A protein has these predicted regions:
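Conserved structural motif at the start of ABC-family nucleotide-binding domains
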Residues: 2-4, 17-19
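Short coil-to-beta microelement around the adenine-binding A-loop and adjacent beta1/P-loop entry
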Residues: 14-15, 73
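ABC nucleotide-binding domain signature
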Residues: 31, 75-84
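The feature captures the beta-strand-to-loop junction immediately N-terminal to the Walker
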Residues: 33-35
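Helix-to-loop junction immediately C-terminal to a conserved catalytic motif
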Residues: 48-49
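ABC ATPase NBD Q-loop/coupling interface
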Residues: 58-74
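ABC-family P-loop ATPase nucleotide-binding domains
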Residues: 87-120
Length: 120
């Protein structure tokens, strides 16, 4: 499902990730843990497509090299960052926002979109 091999990431001449590797098979759950500055956020940023990093290595998700596809395509595959405490957007209902996001991913995967009752 997710295979990362020899992933290195550098920003502003500082190497953060050095030959990182990880394999997550379908059904497995993993936690990325470590002290401040160990590269957890950098890993998430690189996988989700944040710009500004010099990247070497490979990161395959469901057979697709994430590092070769645009941010929008990564998000459609479900690879994106979300804020733990998102800001409120006036006039935007949180449930509707989440349903729209989920349905965009479902549509990309060829699945039927959920109506409001199915979503809840």
């Amino acid at each position: 499902m997710l295979i990362i091999s020899n992933l290195s990431a550098t920003i502003e001449d500082k190497k953060i990730l050095k030959n990182f590797g990880l394999e997550i098979k379908p059904g497995e759950v993993h936690a990325i843990m470590g002290p401040n500055g160990s590269g957890k956020s950098t890993l998430a940023n690189v996988l989700s497509g944040k710009k500004g990093y010099k990247i070497d290595g490979k990161a395959f998700y469901e057979g697709t090299d994430l590092l070769e596809i645009p941010i929008e395509e990564r998000a459609k595959k479900g690879i994106f960052l979300a804020f733990q405490y998102p800001i409120e957007i006036p006039g935007v209902n949180t449930n509707n926002f989440l349903k729209t996001s989920l349905n965009a991913i479902r549509k990309h995967r060829g699945l039927k979109e959920l109506d409001s009752l199915e979503f809840l």
